[in-house]
Amino acid sequence: MLHLLYALVLLLLLCGACAILAERFTLSPALLPLPVLSGAVVVLYLCGVAGFLRVGAVAVLLALAAVWVVGLVQYRPAGVADAWKRAASVPSFTLFLGGAVFIWLLFCVQQPMFTQWDEFTAWGLAPKMVVERGAFYVADPVNLKASFTYPATSLITFLFQPFGPWAEWA
């Protein structure tokens, strides 16, 4: 349950930051979740290369919170609420937010596991190693199970599970 709570809070931070940035730069908020997540993955990648992957996760969380703080100071709470209302009126942004919440709730209820050789199992091996070790999986040259997985998939999973035990469904 804590995994779900953390994921939903992170999603709130992410979407709120997108709404505030969209207000600041007069962009559609639907354009921002992918670049913001990509930027988070770049930060995690650079910190992972340096051996500080968990520090990178904290840096991403602090950066998202900083956008909220700047937004609350610059636009006041009423302005941030207006930015949220404008963001919620954009169908693609609402679809992103609603779809993410739906997937998280679905996985929380069903809690799928890596039990067979399917796409879900193949995709999940590398993120599992990254989350459990707090480092890239290539640090162990003996274990080649996840050598085919791109680092970004592992890092985006790590962003949503940087602390605590690994949960396959999360």
Regions found by a protein language model. Give the residues of each.
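Generic serine detector
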Residues: 28, 38, 89-92, 147, ...
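Internal/C-terminal transmembrane anchor helices
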Residues: 88-109
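Active-site lumenal/periplasmic loops and adjacent helix-entry segments of GT-C-fold
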Residues: 102-170
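Membrane-embedded, hydrophobic transmembrane alpha-helices
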Residues: 1-87
